[in-house]
Regions:
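Short, well-structured N-terminal submotif of metal-dependent ribonuclease cores
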Residues: 1-39, 52-56, 122-131
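Short strand-turn motif at the edge of the Rossmann-like AdoMet-binding core
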Residues: 42
Protein backbone atom coordinates (compact mmCIF):
# COMPACT_ATOMS: atom_id res chain seq x y z
CA UNK A 1 0.00 0.00 0.00
CA UNK A 2 1.39 3.38 -1.08
CA UNK A 3 0.30 6.53 0.73
CA UNK A 4 0.78 10.24 0.28
CA UNK A 5 0.83 12.06 3.61
CA UNK A 6 -0.90 15.46 3.63
CA UNK A 7 0.74 18.50 5.20
CA UNK A 8 -1.72 18.62 8.11
CA UNK A 9 -0.55 15.20 9.32
CA UNK A 10 3.08 16.32 9.17
CA UNK A 11 2.29 19.47 11.14
CA UNK A 12 0.42 17.45 13.78
CA UNK A 13 3.69 15.66 14.49
CA UNK A 14 6.08 18.58 14.11
CA UNK A 15 3.99 20.84 16.35
CA UNK A 16 2.77 18.07 18.70
CA UNK A 17 -0.84 19.10 18.01
CA UNK A 18 -3.27 17.34 20.28
CA UNK A 19 -5.55 15.46 20.01
CA UNK A 20 -4.14 14.45 16.61
CA UNK A 21 -0.53 13.71 17.55
CA UNK A 22 -0.85 10.00 18.36
CA UNK A 23 -2.55 8.94 15.12
CA UNK A 24 -0.45 11.24 12.93
CA UNK A 25 2.79 10.07 14.55
CA UNK A 26 1.61 6.50 13.98
CA UNK A 27 1.49 7.15 10.23
CA UNK A 28 5.14 8.25 10.26
CA UNK A 29 6.02 5.24 12.42
CA UNK A 30 4.36 3.02 9.80
CA UNK A 31 6.59 4.63 7.15
CA UNK A 32 9.64 4.19 9.37
CA UNK A 33 8.88 0.49 9.69
CA UNK A 34 9.00 0.05 5.92
CA UNK A 35 5.65 1.32 4.67
CA UNK A 36 5.68 3.07 1.29
CA UNK A 37 4.99 6.74 1.96
CA UNK A 38 5.51 10.01 0.14
CA UNK A 39 4.97 13.72 0.69
CA UNK A 40 4.40 16.34 -1.98
CA UNK A 41 7.28 18.71 -2.69
CA UNK A 42 5.18 21.70 -1.64
CA UNK A 43 4.47 20.06 1.73
CA UNK A 44 8.16 20.48 2.48
CA UNK A 45 8.08 24.19 1.73
CA UNK A 46 4.82 24.63 3.67
CA UNK A 47 6.37 22.92 6.69
CA UNK A 48 9.58 24.92 6.37
CA UNK A 49 7.57 28.14 6.39
CA UNK A 50 5.20 27.20 9.21
CA UNK A 51 7.93 25.66 11.36
CA UNK A 52 10.21 28.68 10.89
CA UNK A 53 12.74 26.52 9.11
CA UNK A 54 12.18 23.08 10.55
CA UNK A 55 15.35 21.68 9.01
CA UNK A 56 15.74 18.95 11.60
CA UNK A 57 12.14 17.78 11.24
CA UNK A 58 12.35 17.80 7.45
CA UNK A 59 15.71 16.04 7.42
CA UNK A 60 14.31 13.27 9.62
CA UNK A 61 11.14 13.10 7.54
CA UNK A 62 13.08 12.61 4.33
CA UNK A 63 14.68 9.51 5.81
CA UNK A 64 11.18 7.97 5.89
CA UNK A 65 9.36 9.15 2.78
CA UNK A 66 9.77 9.74 -0.93
CA UNK A 67 9.06 12.98 -2.77
CA UNK A 68 7.24 12.26 -6.04
CA UNK A 69 8.65 13.79 -9.21
CA UNK A 70 6.12 16.27 -10.53
CA UNK A 71 6.24 18.87 -13.26
CA UNK A 72 4.25 21.20 -15.45
CA UNK A 73 1.78 18.51 -16.54
CA UNK A 74 0.98 17.70 -12.92
CA UNK A 75 0.59 21.38 -12.03
CA UNK A 76 -1.81 21.88 -14.94
CA UNK A 77 -3.75 18.82 -13.82
CA UNK A 78 -4.09 20.38 -10.36
CA UNK A 79 -5.23 23.71 -11.80
CA UNK A 80 -7.99 21.89 -13.72
CA UNK A 81 -9.03 19.81 -10.72
CA UNK A 82 -12.62 19.83 -9.45
CA UNK A 83 -11.31 20.15 -5.89
CA UNK A 84 -12.19 23.50 -4.34
CA UNK A 85 -8.86 23.98 -2.59
CA UNK A 86 -5.89 24.39 -4.93
CA UNK A 87 -3.34 23.19 -2.36
CA UNK A 88 -5.31 19.97 -2.00
CA UNK A 89 -5.40 19.64 -5.79
CA UNK A 90 -1.59 19.80 -5.80
CA UNK A 91 -1.56 17.03 -3.18
CA UNK A 92 -3.77 14.91 -5.44
CA UNK A 93 -1.53 15.59 -8.44
CA UNK A 94 1.49 14.42 -6.43
CA UNK A 95 -0.42 11.34 -5.27
CA UNK A 96 -1.35 10.48 -8.86
CA UNK A 97 2.22 11.02 -10.06
CA UNK A 98 3.46 8.63 -7.37
CA UNK A 99 0.60 6.17 -7.94
CA UNK A 100 -0.47 6.40 -4.31
CA UNK A 101 -3.35 4.23 -3.18
CA UNK A 102 -4.43 6.65 -0.46
CA UNK A 103 -3.98 10.21 0.77
CA UNK A 104 -3.68 10.30 4.56
CA UNK A 105 -5.23 13.53 5.80
CA UNK A 106 -7.46 14.95 8.50
CA UNK A 107 -9.24 17.13 5.94
CA UNK A 108 -11.39 14.39 4.43
CA UNK A 109 -14.12 16.75 3.26
CA UNK A 110 -11.60 18.61 1.07
CA UNK A 111 -10.92 15.43 -0.90
CA UNK A 112 -14.49 14.32 -1.70
CA UNK A 113 -13.91 14.74 -5.44
CA UNK A 114 -10.40 13.31 -5.40
CA UNK A 115 -9.59 10.38 -7.69
CA UNK A 116 -7.28 9.13 -4.91
CA UNK A 117 -9.16 7.99 -1.81
CA UNK A 118 -8.54 10.08 1.30
CA UNK A 119 -8.39 8.45 4.73
CA UNK A 120 -7.83 9.78 8.24
CA UNK A 121 -4.64 8.87 10.11
CA UNK A 122 -6.59 6.75 12.63
CA UNK A 123 -8.51 4.88 9.93
CA UNK A 124 -5.33 4.35 7.95
CA UNK A 125 -3.59 2.82 10.96
CA UNK A 126 -6.53 0.46 11.49
CA UNK A 127 -6.42 -0.52 7.80
CA UNK A 128 -2.64 -1.01 7.88
CA UNK A 129 -3.03 -3.24 10.94
CA UNK A 130 -5.50 -5.38 9.01
CA UNK A 131 -8.66 -3.95 10.54
Amino acid sequence: MRILIDTDVLLDVALAREPHLTASAGVLEWAESGGEAAVAWHSLTNCAYLLKGGRSFLSNLLQLVEVPETGTRDALLALDSPLGDLEDAFQVAAALAWKADLIVTRNLSDYRKSPVVAISPADFLAKAAGG
